[in-house]
């Protein structure tokens, strides 16, 4: 049985990034956890614009805070995407049901989130570069997890819309 990875947004700041990640989750059939408080309303116009008409297809769980998120996901490994991690994404092995935790755009993740996550993983970047956009990073992490877990075979070709060129 395939159990897809999921993405968690820790107190997201920027609605456009959250909307782009929601669209990613809709397109890959990945659950999304939003850990509040957010720096915007979840019905924000900018969020809807970035997510377009894909938002209705997102399986989203909202959590009032980190503790509520932890309480609702006790059986899952939490993998923190962090620019400060020692383990590189290409060297990390994902497991079914892993939750990829993305920190705030403005401040990353606080120490208690680092400590609560079983693994911390970073993207390999050119020396001297700090990080990339959180939506881009979420996409890279999600695609690598899906690739490793053979999740793409679940999606099948019927998901393609050949009318779009």
Segments (PLM) and residue ranges:
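Post-transcriptional modification and biogenesis factors for structured RNAs
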Residues: 1-165
């Amino acid at each position: 049985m395939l159990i897809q990875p999921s993405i968690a947004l820790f107190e997201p700041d920027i609605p456009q990034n959250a909307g782009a990640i929601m669209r990613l989750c809709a397109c890959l059939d990945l659950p999304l956890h939003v850990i509040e408080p957010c720096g915007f309303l979840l019905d924000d116009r900018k969020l809807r614009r970035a997510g377009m008409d894909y938002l209705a297809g997102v399986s989203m769980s909202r959590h009032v805070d980190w503790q509520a998120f932890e309480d609702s996901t006790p059986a899952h490994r939490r993998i923190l995407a962090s620019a400060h991690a020692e383990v590189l994404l290409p060297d990390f092995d994902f497991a079914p049901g892993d939750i990829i935790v993305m920190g705030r755009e403005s401040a990353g993740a606080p120490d208690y989130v680092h400590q609560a996550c079983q693994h911390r993983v970073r993207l390999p970047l050119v020396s001297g570069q700090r990080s990339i956009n959180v939506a881009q990073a979420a996409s890279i992490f999600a695609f690598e997890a899906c690739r490793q877990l053979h999740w793409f075979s679940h999606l099948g070709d019927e998901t393609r819309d050949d009318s779009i060129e």
